[in-house]
Amino acid sequence: MPVHLSTRARTRLPEWFRVELPTGAALERYRATTGAVAGNALHTVCEEAHCPNIHECWGRGTATFMVAGRECTRGCRFCAVETLRTPAAPDPAEPQQLADAVAAMGLSYAVITVVNRDDLPDGGAAHYRACLDAVHARLPDVGLELLCSDLAGNEAALAALLNGVPLQVFAHNVETVERLTPEVRDPRASFAQSLRILAAAKELRPELVTKSSIMLGLGETEAEIHDAFSALRDVGVELLTLGQYLAPGPGYHPVREFVTPERFDALARTARELGFRAIASGPLVRSSYRAESLLAAAQSEPVTARLQVVA
């Protein structure tokens, strides 16, 4: 869920959006992460989407890598990533560069997210798989999570991507409730199509943990949120993240509401009652935030976790 805290917007944010900058050892890890990313000519969703958690996550030596280019073929009204109808072809060197960066950072778990590539016949699936395979070949003990596009509904491409690929978590974000999807997401996306991709992933690989994310504060109602939860559970989604939507700038979908931490807690409890194995819920939670910890929580016992960054 990409965000950008502009100077103008930052003065209007509630107090619970304060973020600490890294110091000491955390600052050194932040710099090392910066070097590993830049040194391997990689992109991260942390940077491209202006994530507010970048200092915390990079200060812990973790990052979410974004593959298949810096530009997305879709223009969603919530997202800061640049839109381009025909981006450059995926870099064939990227899979190895990704593996090198994961090795340099000493990661035990890597989250790989993607841009939409509607310009490619398979939606980018072959390149996404090459990236996963390269990391696994170099570092077979590293856990892998893929935050995937909807592949334009191409289930054959999804099968080619998932069959036999070394992966622990398959994630795809519905982003918002069904009613708001046409306002918030690119016209080529739909709530139903996202559900179909999540369902198909579970059918292809029943052992995979599936995950999705919803932004709050776009104008959704409580009933619509509950309906979205139920729809995700109906297709077998097990992990859920909930976070506050923050507009990247003028011209994007407006923020309709700042959701309080207490309401995030209440929604997490509701989600838990519906059967999600683990939930990360809080104003600054993003879909890949502390992903390894969320998976570990789900594998140990059902929990509800509110992950929030405050000063």
Model-derived features: where do they sit?
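A short acidic, helix-capping loop that chelates divalent metal ions and anchors anionic groups
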Residues: 116-121, 178-184, 248-254
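Auxiliary Fe-S-binding modules of radical SAM enzymes
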Residues: 1-64, 68, 80, 96-103, ...
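Acidic/histidine-rich catalytic cores of soluble enzymes
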Residues: 152, 170-191
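Conserved glycine-rich "GG(E/T)P / GGGxP" loop and the immediately following alpha-helix
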Residues: 110-129, 219-224
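Hydrophobic residues within beta-strands of alpha/beta enzymes
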Residues: 110-112, 144, 170-172, 240, ...
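Short pre-active-site segment immediately N-terminal to redox-active cysteine/selenocysteine motifs
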Residues: 68-75
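Short, ordered loop/turn segments at secondary-structure junctions
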Residues: 84, 115-117, 149, 174-177, ...
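Conserved alpha-helical substructure of the radical SAM core
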Residues: 83-110
